[in-house]
Regions:
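Short strand-turn segments of transmembrane beta-barrel domains in outer membranes
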Residues: 43-46, 70-79, 102
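C-terminal segment of classical bacterial N-terminal signal peptides
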Residues: 15-24
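Bacterial N-terminal signal peptides that target proteins for export
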Residues: 1-10
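Periplasmic N-terminal accessory/gating domains of Gram-negative outer-membrane beta-barrel systems
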Residues: 47, 51-61
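Short active-site-proximal "capping" loops at secondary-structure junctions
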Residues: 62-63, 77-81
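Outer-membrane beta-barrel porins/channels
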Residues: 25-42, 46, 84, 91-102, ...
Length: 281
């Protein structure tokens, strides 16, 4: 038996149903820590700057402005904070106050690496690049016994994006670039199961899944005046179909029979958002 779930990385990515949190810039669960140099200038003009190999991710056309072979790498450390504040929630069946354990700080420390390499070939007419980064991620983990444990106790989503790219100059002023993204995504969701009606301690459920899929990005840069560039970039959505398992622990035999709470295969659809950007530099 397989259980299917449809998820979306858009708007607010699972924020209510799975209690996941992240730094948000309009697409819900996207991470901005994809370039050390970009972070240093708040990504101003990212689609047109083309100052180092991280342009592979922001606009591969920018590789034509890099000479020889160049490499850049970064490691970003993110300390997230996520707290739940209750205002007197009650049990809908008994009317009693659920409790006062608000779960503490569900955030944590996360390490986000990136790596980019660009080299020229064809007597300097063409560029090839390879980028590896983590465009989506982070998660939550609440204290044991917290009042929302039947919704979520732990949630985690990690991605790895492998982005080879090619670029060339169409004219002296126009550069064109195209890249492909081989993207891996891994998700883990955990929650407790209420068995107090049967006089038993909580059981637990854990959903895991992962998958690989393909996307693409491309862009142009037009140098309309010396040292002045206009850039356009598009990155496609990637439609993931995670395959994994649902595992239960400590479930009473009666609930296994009545509610079907037995280990089974599971699938979940996660759609990452497309993005369009335009910059002047």
């Amino acid at each position: 038996m397989k259980q299917s779930i449809q998820l979306s990385v858009g708007g607010v990515f699972l924020a209510s149903s799975l209690s996941l949190t992240s730094q948000v810039y309009g697409s819900g669960f996207a991470l901005i820590e994809n370039s050390a140099s970009g972070m240093g200038q708040a990504f101003a003009g990212a689609a047109a700057v083309a100052e180092d190999p991280s342009t592979i991710y922001f606009n591969p056309a920018g590789m034509t402005y890099l000479d020889g072979s160049q490499l850049t790498a970064g490691l970003h450390i993110v300390r997230s904070k996520s707290e739940f504040n209750d205002k007197g929630s009650t049990d809908p069946f008994r009317g009693a106050i659920i409790g006062n354990n608000e779960g503490g700080n569900a955030g944590g420390t996360h390490y986000i690496p990136n790596f980019y390499y660009v080299t020229e070939f064809g007597e300097g007419k063409y560029r090839f690049g390879l980028g590896v980064n983590a465009p989506f991620g982070l998660g939550t983990e609440y204290d044991d016994g917290w009042m929302g444990r039947y919704t979520s106790t732990k949630s985690e989503l990690q991605t790895v994006n492998i982005n080879p790219a090619f670029a060339f100059k169409g004219t002296d002023r126009l550069s064109i670039g195209l890249g492909f993204s081989l993207q891996y995504i891994d998700a883990t969701l955990e929650s407790n199961i209420n068995q107090t009606a049967f006089g038993a301690a909580d059981a637990s459920a854990k959903v895991t899944g992962d998958t690989w899929n393909l996307g693409y990005n491309g862009g142009i840069i037009y140098e309309y005046a010396p040292q002045s560039k206009l850039g356009f970039h598009y990155r496609s959505s990637i439609n993931h179909e995670l395959e994994g398992k649902v595992n239960y622990d400590g479930v009473l035999p009666a609930l296994e029979l009545i509610a079907g709470l037995v280990d089974k295969d599971a699938s979940a659809g996660i759609d990452t958002p497309s993005a369009i950007s335009a910059s002047i530099a």
